[in-house]
Amino acid sequence: MAVAIKTQNLPLIKKIRNIPKEEMYVPGHRTCAGCGPALQYRLVAKAAGPNTIFLGPTGCMYVANASYLCTPYAVPWMHTQITNGGAVASGIEAAYKVLIRKGKWQGEFPNIIVMAGDGGAVDIGLQAMSALMYRGHDVLFVCYDNESYANTGIQTSPTTPYGGNTTFTPPGPMIPEGKKLYPKDPPQLVIGGHPAVKYVATASVAYPIDLMNKVRKALNVVGPTFLHIHAPCPKGWKTDQDKTVMLAKLAVETG
């Protein structure tokens, strides 16, 4: 029997002054200066608000955000393996449905959000993400994409662009172009293979209001949703820490 679980209607943000002042992702992390994924985490958390549970598969945002006695989350957060963010989120969503059906939970149904890097979303974690989408769980799956496995040393990932210079694809005499494979397209991958998905969008840390509104649109929908957020990485991209937003804008403008 279907259970009516979602009653919220998060309003869209029209102007900067309408951005929530309350912070759900606060100081207390160890991300690199100029970190794009940290910026997107703050924006997603602001948009989602206090009625939120975050799932963090292993990656940059787990390692830098989960120091003992010093974490930046002002809402419930749970670490998962890099392979199973989608599976853990599915279990949490199903558990809340059971509690509601049995009358053991009277509060609001929470926003359940998986915050996975490109590896945890469309590479090592692809199977669990795909299963979540296929089964129709009411979860927002965010892929924050810095185009590499930055946490473990800037190795190539499925979203590293053609010609990318990573520790696994260094340009040299034999392969001067670096990475020879073209990247996956996460939004098209989700749309093409998952008929139950209700909302898919792309966003960039360079456009915060657009990003937050897409988060809210996804959370207002009942069913699986997917957001692909482009988030430059100064360490992996070998760029100055104050150029993150500029590079993100250029990436959007150049496709």
What function would you assign to each model-found segment?
Residues 102, 108-112, 123-140, 144-255:
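Glycine-rich ThDP/TPP pyrophosphate-binding loop and its adjacent helix/strand module
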Residues 3-141, 148-149, 154-165, 179-180:
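Cofactor-binding active-site loop characterized by glycine-rich and histidine/acidic residues
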